[in-house]
Amino acid sequence: MTNLSKVTVGYDTFTFELDDLKTAVIGGYNASTGENSGMELVNDCYAEHQVNPDIIIAPGFSSDPEVAAVMAAKAGCINTVFKGRAIIDADCETTKVYSGVPKWKNDNSITGERQILCWPMMKIGERVFHLSSRLAAIMAATDVDNGDCPSKSPDNKELGATSLCLKDGTNVVMNLEKANYLNANGVMTGLNFVGSFKAWGSHTACFPGSSDPVECLIPVARMFDWVGNSLILTYWSRIGDKLDRRLCESIADSSSQWMNSLTAAGHLYGGRVEFDEGENSEKDIMAGILKPHVYMAPVSPLVEVNWIQEYDSSYVTGALGS
């Protein structure tokens, strides 16, 4: 083996136009070559790696409303059957004050149930990072620690930041009042309130326009995605089997047992799978189309605690022994 005492690396400087980069990130399908690019590459992940990407990020580009819209659309239709979420960064260059984020959000139509919006950026030392990249990592790590199940919220999890900041590195001081204002407008942020910097918020970007927990609460929404994706993969091997009563009962029984196991593990309040004859017409059955109905209630995250205090004079009587 040759010992190297010095290695010299040379490189060229490449200059790209922002619009060119944006176009590359959005990508598309090339009918001439049959190749995907940009966001369309999400559809190639499972085919090539047997991994379903359920979190989509584009740090540095997602604050563009066109990119954010494409991310949300792709998250809602991965390989035509799977579903996921897109984490979007609000603009930290023009939106410099927390109170202006809701207006930016609405003006740029970042209000979809499949979008998770965050503001501002964060620092580790002097390095500046987009919050979406950190939130994606937090969500993935939380899922792994939770048995590879997304029933826990990224809310109040370690952010690993030393400060919050704007794009130019200007520090942003985020107190509880400001953080809760952002949360109330469907924006996740960071907060250094008790202990260290934590991710703060459990709502998707559709909040407060929608208060449906399936749409607006991150872990509840992700559980619906995950259960749906898991059922598709689990019963994919049954495609081609005879569509008879035995098959229907087998799918309903085994999937309901799985839902029971999720309930026992604390991921669901409860769940079951049934076949409704009204939803499975004779025409569909003859065409080989089956529609199992999944009923489920994922466990909600704790969002707010309101302590109620009352003076109870009976303790005085008991203490004085009268």
Question: Where on the chain are the PLM-derived regions?
Answer:
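Acidic, low-complexity glycine/serine/threonine-rich segments
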Residues: L217-G278
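Short, ordered beta-strand-loop transition motifs
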Residues: T2, C92, M122-K123, G278-G288
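Structured loops at beta-to-helix junctions and adjacent beta-edge loops in soluble globular domains
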Residues: G10, P59, Y295-A297
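Conserved structured core elements
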Residues: P65-A68, E249, D253, G288
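Compositionally biased, low-complexity/repeat regions
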Residues: F16, A24-N30, L268-S322
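Short loop/turn motifs at secondary-structure junctions
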Residues: N3, V51-N52, H267-Y269
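A glycine- and small-residue-enriched flexible loop/hinge signal that marks low-structured segments
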Residues: L21-A24, Y29-Y235, R272, D276
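Surface-exposed interaction regions enriched in Ser/Thr/Asp/Glu
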Residues: M1-A24
